Amino acid sequence: MPFLDKVKQQYEDWTRITPSNLLYDRALLLLFFVLLLIGLLAVSSASIPVGTRLFKDPFYFAKRDAIYVFLSCVTCYLCVQVPMEKWEQWHVRLFAFAIFLLILVLIPGIGLSVNGARRWIPMVLFNFQPAEFAKLALTCFLASYFTRKYDEVRSRKLSAFKPFALMGLMGLFLLSQPDLGSTVVLFVITFGLLFIVGANFWQFVGLMAFGGLLFVWLVLSSAYRLKRFTGFLDPFKDPYGTGFQLSNSLMAFGRGEWVGEGLGNSIQKLEYLPEAHTDFVMAVVGEEFGFLGILVIVILLGLLIFRAMKIGRESLLLEQRFKGFFAFGISFWIFFQGFVNLGMSLGLLPTKGLTFPLISYGGSSLIIMSMTIGLLLRIDHENRLMRIGQARLRDD
């Protein structure tokens, strides 16, 4: 089709490696900025009622989110300046620091407890969530480990025990908060990288079965988790109890229909939908911008994930395994977290405290996610330099 051919040509022109755009992936950077701006707009609208009630300022959270967006852009820029070899050298220190933070947050008087969960460390501008840093640290550690043990992981049956044991250590501290959602994200990152590495088939199947059984046990062993897990099956059975969040989220999507009620016209955000600007921000987006608004965000995030996976594939083709595994780990992380958040809001999955990447309100989530974008830009930059160097050698 001529139209699709034209779109494809425009995309190839935009992302082609030429001296004028050698330094960065323009498509990835544009997607990053657009999602940040959409997130700022969504949070500004969704947080008006709660900002008015708590601080007598309807734009209290919007102002703070604008600060987080600025800090995220600065963080992304700083990460682009750091060579990937430094991250590979720091993988053990990053992992150890993440464990330290996960222990620190559990100490009474240091960790901030909200709704029975101790997940945050109070800081000047925001409450830092160590779980977000743990995801980045584990991804970096696994990328380095699988680079060094590549042949061993592909051939030996028990070679994945060490990375899963270390992931389990992080998971143990996360479950103590409790934070099952972040624990599952760590498992998905680990499992996804094992798939990319090409781990032994039976080892792969065994770990998947073990992870599934462990998840079932964790759900069944806690009455609170079991209620949340079963509540999504029929949220209207107990609309003022376990199904309160989900029933209001579904009503928000229902009111939005195809094109939404318009910016600022959400009814469910008026104290009916808890966490409207954080975990359930997509429900407010669905109510105000409808199915088409949700579709646009999903497409944008999908394109960002596609770029991340393409960068990972290019790294592996250039035999840069650490960069490739790091990029793939980031793509699995972003995909799964976005999938779970949207699925949770739509009632397809149990409610979990996972933010939607680059959209939901939260300083820790935005800044750490922006670090991953900076890392992807750096990996792509180094890949481009390497390919240009190889091309010049062939020409000579």
Curated annotation (Swiss-Prot):
Keywords: Cell cycle, Cell division, Cell inner membrane, Cell membrane, Cell shape, Cell wall biogenesis/degradation, Glycosyltransferase, Membrane, Peptidoglycan synthesis, Transferase, Transmembrane, Transmembrane helix. Pathway: Cell wall biogenesis; peptidoglycan biosynthesis. Its EC number is 2.4.99.28. One of its GO terms (cellular component) is plasma membrane. The chain crosses the membrane at residues 28-48, 65-85, 94-114, 123-143, 158-178, 184-204, 205-225, 286-306, 324-344, 356-376. Its main location: membrane. One of its GO terms (biological process) is regulation of cell shape. It is found in: Cell inner membrane. GO terms for molecular function: lipid-linked peptidoglycan transporter activity; peptidoglycan glycosyltransferase activity. Belongs to the SEDS family. FtsW subfamily. Peptidoglycan polymerase that is essential for cell division. NCBIfam families: ftsW (TIGR02614). HAMAP family: PGT_FtsW_proteobact. This is Probable peptidoglycan glycosyltransferase FtsW. The gene is ftsW.
